[in-house]
A protein has these predicted regions:
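Conserved functional hotspots at enzyme active or ligand-binding sites that engage polyanionic ligands
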Residues: 1-118
Length: 118
């Protein structure tokens, strides 16, 4: 995808590195920022289809009961992991899946503030 207009809040597919940096896997992620600078960098948060038994304060579960599940474009219940982040160029984004509501984006922002201030 050459460029993504107004990416903040969008759910996208992107090659996301494993936490040991051994390889990457195409995964859904949420764009946390608008594109920044001449290289059009965005901050992304990882989404996994695994639902933890004990969600962390940085986890948001998207399932049939979440109001944004349908608009997210996710095919199955998933967990947004706000402590698992990366910065990438928008040119690495393969496809847009959906979008988070303003209410969910506010929830994301509050959880990120708590993560970085505690």
């Amino acid at each position: 995808m050459a460029s993504l207009s107004n990416p903040r809040g969008k759910v996208v597919l992107v090659p996301f590195p494993f936490d040991d940096l051994s390889t990457t896997k195409v995964r859904p992620a949420v764009c946390l920022t608008h594109a920044i600078g001449p290289y059009q960098h965005v901050l992304l948060a990882f989404i996994t289809s695994r639902i933890p038994d004990q969600p962390l304060p940085t986890d948001i579960i998207f399932d049939a009961s979440h109001p944004d599940f349908a608009s997210s474009g996710l095919r199955k219940p998933s967990t947004l992991r706000l402590h698992y982040l990366m910065t990438a160029r928008t040119s690495l984004i393969l496809r847009e899946l959906g979008r988070l509501s303003d209410a969910t984006q506010s929830d994301v922002a509050q959880r990120l503030c708590a993560l970085f201030t505690n």
